Amino acid sequence: MTALANPVLGNCTAIACCTAGAALRSIEHFAAATGLGRVAHYEELASLGTLPNVLFFLIHFGISDQGKQALLHQIRAHPDLRIRFAPVILISRDLDTEKFLSYVEMGFDDILCLPDAAKLLSDRLLNQLNRDILYIETSKYLGPDRRRLDMPGHTQSGRVSTSRMHVRLYIHRGLAEGPAIVKRQEFWSRSDA
């Protein structure tokens, strides 16, 4: 991939969620090719000092599925909105449909399969910024609204409304202000009425 200069993504910081060595170099190469600015390893997050307004968490495919789920939970449970509502992107190789859907159900903001053209990957990252994105929050899930992708037998029960409520959060991620909740809607189940 050829490195892109991108005035928007260049102001964002990529947080590499991977092991050191080849996986980290792969994420660094991806970040440079798509025009992302600074790259820091996930373990360095606490030592960054003042966080930039927009972070991208880039999770390497080499992490186990259990590890991916744990990372998503840690990020989505973080008290800082810049972390909790940062785009979490899975960087992967080509996937079969079943595996791809399992990652969608986990709650990734996007899944980028390599190799692909740097411009296309950059555009997909830009799609996470400067627009309202609908998130769903239940007692077991916080992430993008993926209900339109539900298929019979889907496995991510945490995304389903509980007997109590679910919340729709409209998130806007701007370079100047970072992620913000621009609209919140609570929905209670009819059985509780």
Give the label of every model feature segment:
Residues 70, 94-110:
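Alpha4 helix (beta4-alpha4-beta5 surface) of REC/receiver domains from two-component response regulators
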Residues 2-31, 57:
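Conserved acidic segment of CheY-like receiver
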Residues 116-125, 137:
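C-terminal output helix
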Residues 130-192:
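CheY-like receiver
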Residues 35-44:
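Short hydrophobic/Thr-rich beta-strand motif most characteristic of the beta2 strand and flanking loop
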Residues 20, 87-96, 116-118:
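Short beta-alpha junction loops
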